[in-house]
Amino acid sequence: MSRHVTVVLLLAIVLLLSSHMIHGQHWSYGLRPGGKREVESLQESYAEVPNEVSFTELQHLECSIPQNRISLVRDALMNWLEGENARKKI
């Protein structure tokens, strides 16, 4: 009796693993196994992309309030330390 249970359990495990492996490979249209595309299909898709890309002029943004980086770091550190001290008091 225990041998039959073992065989049934092993068969169930094999079926579960095999069904997982069967559905694990996904092939899309135009793809070969492993996700490799054919060279011809890639050349066609690149031919559709325009060769020239127009770049817009970059806008230089400035902050209206001049701040020093060191003061920003100092303020952030002070805020963090105040939070740590408040936690220690609780």
UniProtKB/Swiss-Prot annotation:
Q: What does this protein do?
A: Stimulates the secretion of gonadotropins.
What protein family is recorded? Belongs to the GnRH family.
The principal localisation class reads: secreted
Q: Which residues carry this modification: Pyrrolidone carboxylic acid?
A: Q25
Residues of the signal peptide: 1-24
Q: Where is this protein found?
A: Secreted
Supply the name of the protein. Progonadoliberin-1
Q: Which gene encodes it?
A: gnrh1
Which biological processes are named by the entry's GO terms?
hormone-mediated signaling pathway; reproductive process
Name the source's superkingdom: Eukaryota
A GO term for molecular function: gonadotropin hormone-releasing hormone activity
* Keyword presence, Secreted: yes
Q: Which GO terms describe its cellular component?
A: extracellular space
Checking PANTHER family in the record gives: GONADOLIBERIN, PREPROGONADOTROPIN-RELEASING HORMONE 2
What tissue specificity is annotated for this entry? Answer: Forebrain.
Give the modified residues of type Glycine amide: G34
Q: Which UniProt keywords apply?
A: Amidation, Cleavage on pair of basic residues, Hormone, Pyrrolidone carboxylic acid, Secreted, Signal
